[in-house]
Design a protein with these regions (language model features):
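Exposed acidic/polar residues on beta-strands and adjacent loops within beta-sheet cores, strongest
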Residues: 20-179
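Sec-dependent N-terminal signal peptides
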Residues: 4-14
Length: 179
């Protein structure tokens, strides 16, 4: 009887042990940056630096059971193909997923340059918010007489991912000038 109870207890506790928590957020962030930065520097001019504020958790990694569903959008500025010249650098997107063995990898089929990232600005200044399929971003557009280096009109815009993985502009609004 004791063996039967011990066996039942084992099978009751085992699923709880398997539904372990994900690594700490700091470790997840570190691995996302490492993966996205390696990808960005491989396809663009070297020197791309990614920080935690450029990551949006589309589907966060919370437990070992949901890690294969985890998805992160990472924005980075770079010149894909290292074409050079003014105006060739801009904001790009990499989609980082979690693979077997807790490997964080960029999915090139859902990342720049394969997909379209319809940002109305050359450089995104911040991620305002996100859902599983939208990004709300801010950046600056060029006024008529702005030099190529320095856009001056602040805009907030929303991109939504379509069924092909392209990030399409669905809304844009001007923000009041800061005084």
């Amino acid at each position: 009887m004791k063996k039967v109870l011990a066996t039942i207890g084992f099978f009751c506790v085992t699923p709880l042990a398997l539904a372990q928590n994900a690594p700490p957020v700091q470790e997840i962030t570190k691995q996302i940056i490492k993966s996205a930065q390696g990808y960005a520097n491989a396809i663009s001019c070297p020197g791309v630096v990614i920080t935690p504020k450029e990551i949006a958790a589309l589907t966060p990694y919370k437990t070992l059971d949901d890690r294969m569903d985890a998805k992160y959008a990472v924005l980075w500025d770079g010149d894909i193909g290292c074409a050079g010249g003014s105006g060739t650098s801009g904001t790009n997107i990499s989609i980082v997923t979690v693979s077997i063995g807790d490997s964080f990898v960029v999915d090139p089929h859902t990342s720049s340059p394969i997909i379209q990232f319809e940002s109305p600005v050359r450089s995104v200044s911040r991620i305002v918010g996100n859902t599983r399929d939208t990004l709300i971003l801010e950046g600056k557009e060029f006024a008529d007489n702005d030099p190529n280096c320095c856009p001056s009109i602040t805009v907030r815009f929303t991109l939504r991912v379509d069924d092909k993985g392209n990030w399409k502009l669905v809304e844009k609004k001007l923000l009041p000038a800061k005084k």
